[in-house]
């Protein structure tokens, strides 16, 4: 799909049941009521000159280029020359866009713009892609009567501070598009106009540089700029793109659509695709700019093998690497049994690639020892929503939030983890929706420009279930439940049992206040607001799932949505904000050890039979090992081999020293990745992976939206990830006959009811599809559970609160919770290899001023964080974002060792680790921890082995 040049309609589309017919330059056109004359003209094939107008922003009417002449239905001419961008169409209008008078006015306006603009077009980086240049040609400007006396642009300096784009004020025409984009699209309000008249210029904050300002580098201003004022540095360096392809972002679960603009096989820039249904032409700093990792010097592009992790790596051919891996896996199974090996799928890879890895494990390995990174993030979502609503996924589209009246955010900070969706949510909040935030920290969603939470329930980490039950207690005890909805849509016996449980006095806000640390009055106020405020939508993240009662909390959220009647229509719903680009898809594809694709249990003989017929093997009916079980089995000697595609378990999983010991105990680890990550340091075979720019396939985002990933450059290693898995399966004696990922999707559709109607042809036609997509929903399902729940009747489940085993003590008096930051992503393997590290180059520990003062800790001091699992050292950030008794850090840098501290506690139903609650002590120190010193030695040795050095490596385990 080459979409290098998209049509700009000048103003946003309007939705209306009423249609208006008018005449523009003699052409009859019918448009929805409220449509601007400018947009109607473009739809009629008539382009009106413009500079301040663009269809991603509300009309502004400042440039005066789009003036038109209008005659009303009564034949009277409208006074003056109205701006077509701000004038709505009316029935019977007759519009003239091209008259001698209009041409004269436009040339005069353009002449004024040009009089204070450098005329260096031939050497300008946007030459050939500049709207000012285009408009000068469109209006027929051939000369400028004004001399260059008094020009001020020559003295204005560029701002080069941002690593991704430049700001050249000399080329600014003060159209306000960048300022408006920052306000309307992004919602950061970082830009303004300083000065008056010819002195007017765009300013980031109070005349700060872009890097010093509140700018979050989303790129909306760069995208909106009609001149070279704001220009990507890659465009300056490489020149204008020659062709493009539409693909899908490989970062968070928003799954934004992008145009990869190319020059040959080189990416010039990534531009958010305005017809993308998940992101609507918006982006964040990661998707817009942080794609350089794909060509980073650290990429490993040749297969490598070694016998022991103390041996140097040896580059080999693909055939030798695959045969070596296959022979080692077969040797292990012959010696230790069929269950001694397993595989891990990747949530960064495509649906097709995840499907093939689980297929390889179940066919070539002959067991169900397959798992995915969702184990450590959203496995409780799959379990909890399946039990209550009947499907292991969120209920809504992202666009649904624009119809919400009350938004409840629990354990999530979309501004950091899902920033494009956060911008959409903020837009709705600025329009008047109410906001409740449940979070132990004060995040950007609690308070930011023009956003203020109505309630911030700042609970103690680990007490989610107590709080959600207390909210339900208020609703039931005050008669605020949606009785008709419950009777019609829900299982009444489960409701009555749950109602009896919730109404116990022990679940009242007054009783739970002592547990949660949230005043009862706040709990009551928030509950009343959610129950009575209209359409109520719940959005939650890892602050819900990564707890000992993560699954219980997910069920509690579903209970709250059902009791208030907030499932099954626009503006409501239960919406998990999934972290990685394809974590939803990897789960859909059967990456759990107990489920085949489509969340169907492996023990179901009928389900197994359908797969056995297509796959040509007999499947093991017993569920396999989860990731934590694999580690435990490795340490007891029964699990010896692992195929790990695109997942860094050594950095991302909890209790690092336990994980390291398990990896060292294995005899053959095959890692397939872009870089020699932390897990690869324990590997015996390295198979080079491919980035999202080097492959075809699909991703499924947090709203169940299946979108195409398109190959825009040759694979650095010569193979896409799906081709590597196919080749490994063949080496293991199980041939797979695919020549393109579309064939894999056809097989998925044939075997998976929720994907039955999905095909690459349909994706080409529709752009994207939200599953379920089948005979009953051939175009997909934007909103689930309309008219009835997938499971039949919604089921209420009692959510008894149990305190976590991880409790504060005299030795460990603080609670550590972990999370993410905007500029970095997951374990940082991609973003650390981009300029994003200029914003966040290390993990730091947030600590409240009271706790810091008690320990003699100042801002930026080195501090030791110790738990029962281990110790690491970080710099301190003293801040009131955290409450007293709580500390917080991120996990983006391996040397930080955030997961050295986290423990083996996990969710009771799914083994999702309890990352959000770890009892710790924090004290000032002057040197790295023992683990960090040992890590650095091990890292240096492994880098040496990559270069072919022979060294003796000590284990990365503190005995």
Feature locations, PLM:
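Terminal leader/tail segments of proteins
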Residues: 1-21
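Fe-S ferredoxin-like electron-transfer domains
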Residues: 2-9, 64-217, 222-248, 263-267
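Short beta-alpha connecting loops at secondary-structure transitions
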Residues: 22-23, 91-97, 207, 452-459, ...
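Catalytic alpha/large subunits of respiratory electron-transfer oxidoreductases
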Residues: 118, 175, 180, 236-695, ...
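Long, low-complexity segments enriched in small/aliphatic residues
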Residues: 586-587, 592, 741-835
